[in-house]
Curated annotation (Swiss-Prot):
Keyword Cell inner membrane: no
Subcellular location: Cytoplasm
Record gene name: ppp2r4A
GO (cellular component) term, any one: nucleus
Isomerase among keywords: yes
Function as written in the Swiss-Prot or TrEMBL entry: PPIases accelerate the folding of proteins. It catalyzes the cis-trans isomerization of proline imidic peptide bonds in oligopeptides. Acts as a regulatory subunit for PP2A-like phosphatases modulating their activity or substrate specificity, probably by inducing a conformational change in the catalytic subunit, a direct target of the PPIase.
Enzyme class, UniProt record, top EC level: isomerase
Main location: cytoplasm
Superkingdom assignment: Eukaryota
Protein name (database record): Probable serine/threonine-protein phosphatase 2A activator 1
E.C. no: 5.2.1.8
Keywords: Cytoplasm, Isomerase, Rotamase
Length: 325
């Protein structure tokens, strides 16, 4: 785990998301895959798209620094409507039970769920967005669909999670969400999304995409560890990094902190002692502070997600987050 000394989170420079000013004349396009090899990855890592994405994730991390999930926020109508839309998608799962089939991973009923969402995703966005923003749906729909996993491989992983973050970024770019919504993007929207995809993982037995086994942070998620560590900086409950190995602490605080909720979920779905099934997370719990973990997680995200061809070869680029090789 990298513990390179970096400025405190409050010292990060934020240039903000650049909103599209003239939506009426902006040319939205269906996002496509662009990256195919290591040379493409090197270009991507130097690109404005990568810089903007990292900046956005860091901005959200800083916005929720030292703030538990129950923090009183603005909770705008836009945020409420997004949460309502995600909850509506969750009901699809309730109405499409898994098939009786002898498979460890990948229940084929997931494909029925995916098709149901595909059939409705445009209408869901039309209901969410004002008429003036409907031209952006061609891009938004692609990101939201991929944020739910892959219907061919019946899997879900960090690349799908990343596309959900990109979906919220695009909602910022078109001006549907504002800078004043950024706390809520994590504390209300992303937490609802996590509940949704964990439900998908459990009900349909989705295979982890590109898991590293006991050396993975989590078979499915990454970003809640970045944002969750930020939440725990300076927490009033004296929850230290090593505290996540204590079951009583996890049970007491998992509803308040993303990081601890991740540990709780891992302990629920994996068998055996924590230090055996999650060695990387166990080692990270030895870090000196949550600030160091937050900084290290950002570096690890850059190295293990954004720098990997198997993940970024599936990343979709459109007009709102663009890149060409």
């Amino acid at each position: 785990m990298a513990t390179t000394q970096q400025p405190e989170a409050t010292e990060h420079q934020h240039f903000g998301v650049v909103e599209i000013k003239d939506l009426e004349n902006h040319k939205f396009i269906k996002p496509v895959k662009v990256v195919t090899n290591e040379d493409d990855i090197k270009k991507f890592l130097r690109s404005g798209a990568c810089r903007d994405l990292l900046e956005y994730i860091q901005t959200l991390s800083d916005k929720i620094k030292s703030k538990p999930n129950s923090t009183k926020t603005q909770n705008s109508n836009e945020i409420k409507n997004i949460v309502s839309m995600l909850n509506e998608i969750s009901v699809y799962i309730d109405n499409i039970p898994p098939l009786a089939q002898p498979m460890r991973y990948g229940n084929k009923a997931y494909r029925t769920f995916y098709q149901k969402l595909l059939d409705n995703v445009e209408e869901l966005h039309k209901h969410l967005l004002p008429q003036s923003m409907h031209s952006s749906i061609i891009e938004l729909s692609s990101y939201l669909m991929d944020a739910m996993g892959n219907q061919t491989r019946l899997d879900y992983g960090t690349g799908h999670e990343l596309h959900f973050v990109v979906w919220t970024y695009c909602l910022r770019r078109i001006g549907f969400l504002k800078s004043t919504d950024e706390e809520d993007i994590v504390l209300n929207v992303f937490t609802t999304y996590l509940d949704l995809v964990r439900k998908l993982q459990r009900v349909y037995g989705l295979e982890p995409a590109g898991t590293h086994g006991v050396w993975s942070l989590d078979d499915y998620q990454f970003i809640p560890f970045i944002w969750g560590a930020s939440q725990l900086i300076g927490n009033p409950f004296d929850i230290k990094p090593a505290s996540v190995t204590i079951e009583k602490v996890v049970d007491q605080y998992y509803k308040e902190y993303l990081y601890i909720a991740c540990i709780k979920y891992i302990n629920t779905v994996k068998k055996g002692p924590f230090h055996e099934h999650s060695r990387d997370l166990f080692n990270i719990s030895g870090a000196a502070s949550w600030q160091k973990i937050n900084t290290g997680m950002m570096k690890k995200f850059y190295d293990d997600v954004l720098s990997k061809v198997p993940i970024i070869q599936h990343f979709l680029f459109g007009s709102l987050i663009s890149f060409s090789v």
